[in-house]
């Protein structure tokens, strides 16, 4: 489970990450990253932690499949939070094939997308 301070919850935050962030698409998922954004909801001089949110539509599958995909993605992102810049907003959108994919396939696509967004990969 993602720690509370690393969860993206507000609709405005999802919209900011998707509309103003950079995007990297893979066969199973799309990752939107808004780097180094200051959190308008937190006052003070502390550096906000990276926050992540997930979008899994009904095209992925039924409720049980969608929940399983969300849990897998949460677990994968939790292990990769240290790679993300402080204050960044990440939205991981699962594509229809994600429902049939195993953990390793999702991990491979997530790593490739993050690598591309964080400056390590070519288009």
Swiss-Prot record:
The record's InterPro entries line, in alphabetical order, gives: Ribosomal_Su5_D2-typ_SF (IPR020568), Ribsml_uS5_D2-typ_fold_subgr (IPR014721), RNase_P (IPR000100)
Q: Name one GO biological process term.
A: tRNA 5'-leader removal
Please give the catalytic activity noted in the UniProt record: Endonucleolytic cleavage of RNA, removing 5'-extranucleotides from tRNA precursor
State the EC number(s): 3.1.26.5
Molecular function terms in GO for this entry?
Answer: 3'-tRNA processing endoribonuclease activity; ribonuclease P activity; tRNA binding
State a GO cellular component annotated for this protein. ribonuclease P complex
The question of whether tRNA processing is a record keyword is answered with: yes
Keyword annotations: Endonuclease, Hydrolase, Nuclease, RNA-binding, tRNA processing
Q: Whom does it interact with, and what assembly results?
A: Consists of a catalytic RNA component (M1 or rnpB) and a protein subunit.
The record's comment on protein family reads:
Belongs to the RnpA family.
Q: What does this protein do?
A: RNaseP catalyzes the removal of the 5'-leader sequence from pre-tRNA to produce the mature 5'-terminus. It can also cleave other RNA substrates such as 4.5S RNA. The protein component plays an auxiliary but essential role in vivo by binding to the 5'-leader sequence and broadening the substrate specificity of the ribozyme.
Q: What is this protein called?
A: Ribonuclease P protein component
Recorded name of the encoding gene: rnpA
């Amino acid at each position: 489970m993602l720690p509370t301070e690393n969860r993206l919850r507000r609709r405005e935050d999802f919209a900011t990450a998707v509309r103003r962030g950079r995007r990297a698409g893979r066969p199973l998922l799309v990752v939107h990253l808004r780097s180094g954004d200051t959190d308008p909801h937190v006052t003070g001089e502390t550096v906000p932690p990276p926050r992540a949110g997930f979008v899994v539509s009904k095209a992925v599958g039924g409720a049980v499949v969608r929940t399983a995909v969300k849990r897998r993605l949460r677990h994968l992102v939790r292990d990769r939070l240290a790679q993300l810049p402080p204050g960044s907003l990440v939205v991981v959108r699962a594509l229809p094939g994600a429902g049939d994919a195993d953990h390793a396939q999702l991990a491979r696509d997530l790593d490739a997308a993050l690598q591309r967004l964080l400056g390590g990969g070519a288009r």
